[in-house]
Design a protein with these regions (language model features):
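Membrane-anchoring hydrophobic helices of lipid-metabolizing enzymes
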Residues: 1-75, 254, 259
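Non-catalytic C-terminal accessory region of glycerolipid acyltransferases
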Residues: 4-5, 132-262
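Catalytic core of membrane glycerolipid acyltransferases/transacylases, capturing the structured
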Residues: 25-42, 53-55, 70-128
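A generic structural signal for well-ordered alpha-helical segments
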Residues: 52-53, 115, 141, 173
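A generic structural signal for alpha->beta connector loops
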Residues: 57-59, 96, 117, 145, ...
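A secondary-structure boundary/capping signal
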Residues: 64, 79-80, 101-102, 151-153, ...
Length: 262
């Protein structure tokens, strides 16, 4: 009962923050002259950070290459995807990046409106033209020295393991000749379990920024190898943080999901 009441309280606080943040973000957008809406985007990510701080269930730990010397150096950022909580959690990273997200999210009241204000990138898998539009928008941001963020699994992991990566993000990085920045997130699947509105037990989430991987000189022929390299880096880091084996984290391995420790 106490756990349910705490979850209700956190959702109330989150809803209040979202409603209050919309007019603030609208005012910032009106005065933001940057073609990539950098300041608007950063203020939107700040909402995610505040939401995490308002939640007594979550403790966020950042490690790795988080100290960037140039926040305007463009990357294609790649992360595994364990939970809806990943979005506010990854907003702790100290640079602006535009998120590639399902088009349906942009239709949500308040949150979807703010995603549009911040300049995030919608993609509709049912529309064959949507991928091309997404690519052009992502390229424009990268040319404007703003990073772009992808969950290449395309959806939340059903079992907390790292599943198959799509090619799109890697094509974009090679086309733009910008480095890839792998990010491994571990523990968020406990924060907000799939198909549940209640927050999980108090959880520590570890976000590790791994070394960048250059794409200079690569061509489309390198997409498969590059994708395998990045996915392997993330799997190895998740396995290290979880104190388990690589096979237990790899969603394409023959190891049963039940072997994944919680």
């Amino acid at each position: 009962m106490l756990h349910t009441l705490r979850s209700l309280w956190v959702w109330f606080a989150v809803a209040l923050l979202i409603v209050l943040w919309l007019p603030l973000l609208t005012a910032i957008r009106v005065t933001d002259r940057s073609p990539v809406r950098y300041r608007t985007g950063r203020w939107f990510r700040n909402l995610g950070v505040i939401m995490c701080r308002a939640n007594p269930f979550w403790k966020i730990h950042l490690s790795g290459h988080t100290r960037v010397t140039d926040p305007r150096k463009p990357y294609v950022v790649i992360s595994n995807h364990q939970s809806l909580a990943d979005i506010p959690i990854l907003s702790h990273l100290p640079w602006e990046m535009k998120w590639v997200a399902k088009k349906v999210l942009f239709r949500l009241p308040f949150v979807g409106w703010m995603m549009r204000l911040a300049g995030d990138i919608p993609v509709d898998r049912a529309d064959p033209h949507s991928g091309g539009t997404m690519l052009l928008t992502a390229m424009r941001y990268l040319e404007g020295k703003c990073s772009v963020m992808f969950f290449p699994e395309g959806t939340r992991s059903p079992d907390s393991r790292v599943h198959r990566f799509a090619d799109g993000a890697f094509h974009i990085a090679i086309k733009a000749q910008v480095p890839l920045l792998p990010v491994a997130i571990e523990g968020s699947y406990r924060c907000l379990p799939k198909r549940s509105w209640r927050f999980g037990e108090p959880s520590s989430v570890h976000v590790t920024v791994l070394p960048e991987v250059p794409t200079k000189g690569m061509t489309v022929d390198d997409v498969g190898r590059l994708k395998t390299t990045i996915r392997r880096m993330i799997i190895e880091e998740v396995a290290r943080a979880r104190h388990t084996t690589v096979d237990a984290v790899d969603g394409l391995s023959t190891v049963s999901p039940s072997a994944v420790s919680s």
